[in-house]
């Protein structure tokens, strides 16, 4: 991130104000203030690590993944108990994405569930949609299989197994 001295001064002052307003996180803000004031380029890069963008196509794809899980959960609830027994209910939980390699996707899912209030039935679990392993390729394979199902919101246990195993 390239900044003029004036921009660095403004940002430094912002971090100072934040450290005063939020004593619980004061140490973090003081560290960031020091990084900006001294111009440590390597550490400055970490200040904007959460900046980024997800294209409209990527956003729609993530929503499609979440909608697929919603459809599987609803389908499961409509199954008779004998058919439900054939489905591992734990696999119906939307795990999210890997924060280490798919941070933008994790943050988008958190935005959709927290800020937008979508998919309130999804269990955030302890990791709050951090699957701790890359999931994008897996979800894409699952989505392809789900889209090939004739009744996407009335899946049978066999179709769910095919989606899980994609």
Swiss-Prot record:
Pfam families: YfbU. It comes from the Bacteria. Gene3D superfamilies: Helix hairpin bin (1.10.287.680), yfbu gene product, domain 2 (1.10.3190.10). InterPro entries: UPF0304_YfbU, YfbU_alpha-helical_sf, YfbU_helix-hairpin_sf. SUPFAM superfamilies: YfbU-like (SSF116960). NCBIfam families: PRK05445.1 (NF003936). Belongs to the UPF0304 family. This is UPF0304 protein VSAL_I2183. It comes from Aliivibrio salmonicida (strain LFI1238).
């Amino acid at each position: 991130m390239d900044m003029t001295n004036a921009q660095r001064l403004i940002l430094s002052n912002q971090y100072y104000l934040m450290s005063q307003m939020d004593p619980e996180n004061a140490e973090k803000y003081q560290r960031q203030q020091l990084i900006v004031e001294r111009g440590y380029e390597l550490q400055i890069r970490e200040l904007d690590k959460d900046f980024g963008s997800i294209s409209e196509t990527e956003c729609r794809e993530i929503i499609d993944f979440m909608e697929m899980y919603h459809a599987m959960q609803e389908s499961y609830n409509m199954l008779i108990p004998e058919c439900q027994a054939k489905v591992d209910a734990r696999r119906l939980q939307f795990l999210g994405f890997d924060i280490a390699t798919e941070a933008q996707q994790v943050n988008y899912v958190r935005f959709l569930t927290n800020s937008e209030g979508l998919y309130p039935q999804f269990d955030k679990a302890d990791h709050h949609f951090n699957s701790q392993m890359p999931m994008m390729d897996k979800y894409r394979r699952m989505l392809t299989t789900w889209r090939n199902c004739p009744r996407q919101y009335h899946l049978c246990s066999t179709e769910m197994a095919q989606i899980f195993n994609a």
